[in-house]
Amino acid sequence: MARTIFCTYLQRDAEGQDFQLYPGDLGKRIFNEISKEAWAQWQQKQTMLINEKKLTMMNPDHRKLLEAEMVNFLFEGKEVHIEGYTPPEK
């Protein structure tokens, strides 16, 4: 049975994660406060950041940057700025 949580990012009740996806206290916070839908949105932004900024997860500085962007996006409502990216017009 799916768990329902109040998603901090979406500001509504939504289906929660099945298990903790990220380590440590931040991972616990994500598990308790971020829905599957919001996490999927973050993963799209994360992929774009990694590709456009040519980040490597072997570099501790790159991991710190990505974690800071994740916290800003999921918990502080800040949009991820990706240089050179123009969203498609609707």
UniProtKB/Swiss-Prot annotation:
Cellular component terms per the entry's GO annotation: cytosol
Its job: Could be a mediator in iron transactions between iron acquisition and iron-requiring processes, such as synthesis and/or repair of Fe-S clusters in biosynthetic enzymes.
Record keywords, A-Z: Iron
Protein's name according to its UniProt entry: Probable Fe(2+)-trafficking protein
Superkingdom field: Bacteria
SUPFAM superfamilies found in the cross-reference section: YggX-like (SSF111148)
Subunit architecture: Monomer.
Keyword Mitochondrion: no
